[in-house]
């Protein structure tokens, strides 16, 4: 594959390798010292992070979750720290914080518990099989207190069956496959292979992605703060290597019980998972609706191999660690009317064309699917349909195509306190005509497309709010994306580590979306290690980026109080596509009270007609010039077609493309000075740190 020689990840590796060697030496020294004195040393202090940064840097932003997250690169290990690196198609780029720990047989990584815990989640990667489809391999879990093991050792059986996609959209599980779309432009050869002679060849597997999966484990007892969780790769296992990215630890509450309810067991649901429970759940739902009861599903693993259609009912589980719905992806005998060729476990409202569903409340259970490939016509999502006047809370969704996909028109849905991980595509999508709905306190990790999206295709979404959510490590597209719509809000979210063909926060007039109208407010969001490299354009994006493709973006768009930390390339980007550069514009976006802490290149990159205003936008650790202004590339009258308005208070300095030394990051470039350099040298910024107001 072709990689940018300017990419900061490439230059960091040598430094990180040296640092890792020193760290491993120190670990070995500590172990030797403990043996020499004949007594155990105290455990290493727990390092708790959020999105792999100090929690103080993102306080008040993102989801409040019951677990504490620890990065493996901050733990004690006899393995090797890999990364940091941000090049797509690499294991380290998809890791939280862009670093992880690689273990081989006999090696371990140890995490000191920061609080009492009885459950853990391990995010990991192991190799695929040579022909695709994954392998399984063990990972031993033990707990050490004052140098001695306590409790029972446990073994996790890791799998890569739900990891690894390859090639071009819509991707494949086959690492040996030839190009899926030879008629498309391919950046690796800078050509259209089907139109090129001699035909180019490509390294296989081509464009590997989606390296990670995660697994939860109840430990059987509560361990104390300061105990050490040791993850060890046993001597014999199928995996040549095991990469551990992070460990979440939490104290899970006892199962919830509902006595005055329609208990699913009484209708034949099987908590052992041996028999399909779908029909039993239908019976329980019918009984509950007739008698105005909730459906209660006690602890157990329930096999469900189709959709459960819900309308006017509450489904209450014992908790997402206890009540688990799972099943196989099932091939249909003939395509369904909606184009699906598979079905699988999921809870669906009636479709809007059938009147939709109302007053549905889904609480405190897990849905673990069996989706391993992307078929965009398939309805194999965890939750779907149209759900008005409804709520979803306390769910855990894994291994479905999309966690929650809603097709409007529908109104007044609340999605709260839910975890969505390891999705083939989006975590959540409001698709067409979803109104007055809220997504709050949702934690997302490892999606294969946008984390949270509002997509106004054919019908405008309006009056919706994405608030206090965390989105980490989406392997494709954006953390949060808004495609058209009216009067929507994105507030107090935390987004980190997007990988390619998207970035942290995105506003786009594309994919056939209805126009932006009314207002769009993006307020108090934080993006960490965003501003990715766009492989097709061969340029860097912004941590937040606006893309006018189908039409202008000219609504009342305000970005207020956002923080952009450690952006690989730019903090802010406004762009159109070359083929429409003289037809579309981005007008009147207002940036206010924004902090930019570290960019590889610029604070603002403008590659479009239009303009934006800046007030109290402060920047430090800027890698190149404060502004890359290309406009629409026509450069009329010595300027560009994009105007920057300085409303004052924009502090901080950057390099200047015209003279030596530094200048105010914005003032030198106002109103439309052409400073067009899409590929300047990239300077990797320092890690985010407590804010000190810049001057200049």
Q: Locations of the language-model features?
A:
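Extracytoplasmic
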Residues: 37-259
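Short glycine/acidic-rich loop motifs that flank beta-strands on beta-rich extracellular proteins
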Residues: 293, 304-307, 319-320, 324-329, ...
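Acidic Gly/Asp/Thr-rich repetitive segments characteristic of extracellular carbohydrate-active
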Residues: 264-296
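Surface-exposed intrinsically disordered loops and tails
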Residues: 160-216, 269, 332-350, 378, ...
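Extracellular beta-strand-rich solenoid/capping regions of secreted or surface-exposed proteins
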Residues: 282, 287, 302-316, 324-364, ...
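Leucine-rich solenoid repeat scaffolds
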Residues: 606-675
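Right-handed parallel beta-helix
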Residues: 321, 358-369, 388-399, 410-425, ...
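Secretory targeting and sorting signals
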Residues: 1-38
